[in-house]
Amino acid sequence: MSASRTVICLLRNDLRLHDNEVFHWAQRNAEHIIPLYCFDPRHYQGTYHYNFPKTGPFRLRFLLDSVKDLRALLKKHGSTLLVRQGKPEDVVCELIKQLGSVSTVAFHEEVASEEKSVEEKLKEICCQNKVRVQTFWGSTLYHRDDLPFSHIGGLPDVYTQFRKAVEAQGRVRPVLSTPEQVKSPPSGLEEGPIPTFDSLGQTEPLDDCRSAFPCRGGETEALARLKHYFWDTNAVATYKETRNGMIGVDFSTKFSPWLALGCISPRYIYEQIKKYEVERTANQSTYWVIFELLWRDYFKFVALKYGNRIFYMNGLQDKHVPWNTDMKMFDAWKEGRTGVPFVDANMRELALTGFMSNRGRQNVASFLTKDLGLDWRLGAEWFEYLLVDHDVCSNYGNWLYSAGIGNDPRENRKFNMIKQGLDYDNNGDYVRQWVPELRGIKGGDVHTPWTLSNSALSHAQVSLNQTYPCPIITAPEWSRHVNNKSSGPSSSKGRKGSSYTARQHKDRGIDFYFSKNKHF
């Protein structure tokens, strides 16, 4: 093997050593390996439509943790991680010219247009410098080439059809082993400092003791989380029953932030599930973890199929909807002051921790698109900014789904905020945790403070439009759930009557917003 065979392993959303085909291939084909991560300045600019910061403080902290952890792991394996601030195509070009010995640039392929644009620029630079490009697919449970469809255009537009096809005909590739040693970079290369919050124009977020995701980034933490959730606590065995929880760390797997940055492989999770099913138990809960991984796969393959249409206002269905951009309404939504406690609690949790449960995400998305009639991209880009686990395909795919212009076979899906609050936070504990100005209201009454009598509000030290806002909007279907509230452990009915009648939601001409047949 020629001593000049140096491979640059460009890492992006694959910040791990286990089950990493880039490292696996480079170990067999290089004399020297340069693991490289670039803090791309484009990731810290504004979002496309509404100019929110693309990377918020929670995801940045998680990313910095992950980069630090990968560098530490690589050092334990005889290498290190080069870190640079700059566009990957520029950094790679400089390294090629500086070293004169780079034979190959290897990386995992991404899906969305901005990432694909970087890949095309890398290929151009490598072509100009007579350097080979080696790419891999490694972000999904099922490999792109193993799907039971002749081409990506044959991907079903309904998740259930996709799931049944891959479960019946697909196969999950085995996990690649973690290399005992990683070949070292050429001598003389500076590893480079890992940026700080200040250098990236951000302020480090404060920890919040109420957070349902108090975890840190990196492969080490990801594997520890899996061990805890599967093997130490057996929490996975009840996942299907607890996954819609709102409070606490272990009601769901919480794998998504590590999956988003590639700190853990979906195939490794699958392998551990299968091992758990053999050694402990196999039930609906263990299957449901795989079911959710398949949703993640599906959104990536949908993005492959439709390209930039996942970002279009009219969505995958090219459905014209007269979305509005009332920024006062949007500000109330994003700041958690809509006057609808279940919505506000979720939005405040997101703002203060970077995390929100899946149940919460579905509800606040439905409220923004179906109740407020706001452009779904406002919500998608706000989530992109704040979510610690932002994944472009999952985020935009889910927002399209919620807005009724994506992959949802059921038209007119609209969540009832009061019913949902009572179903998933029956006693109101979650709302009181994140909307402390309503702590004086007991039981399920906390979901509809505007329906309480003046004396009840006074007793709870709540003054509508002073200590807590009246709803910016209400929907007629909410009223049928007002009498079904728990007033505490005794589950007695909540009081009826109000000193305030909220403005009723009027039909804005968006027919699919409302359906009397749907009771979510």
Swiss-Prot record:
The keyword Cytoplasm does not apply. Its cofactor is FAD; (6R)-5,10-methylene-5,6,7,8-tetrahydrofolate. It comes from the Eukaryota. Keywords: Chromophore, FAD, Flavoprotein. The keyword Lyase does not apply. Residues 5-141 form the Photolyase/cryptochrome alpha/beta domain. Binds 1 FAD per subunit. Residues 479-504 are annotated as: Disordered. GO terms for biological process: photoreactive repair. One of its GO terms (molecular function) is deoxyribodipyrimidine photo-lyase activity. May have a photoreceptor function. Has weak cyclobutyl pyrimidine photolyase activity when expressed in E.coli and when tested in vitro. NCBIfam families: crypto_DASH. Belongs to the DNA photolyase class-1 family. This is Cryptochrome DASH. It comes from Danio rerio (Zebrafish).
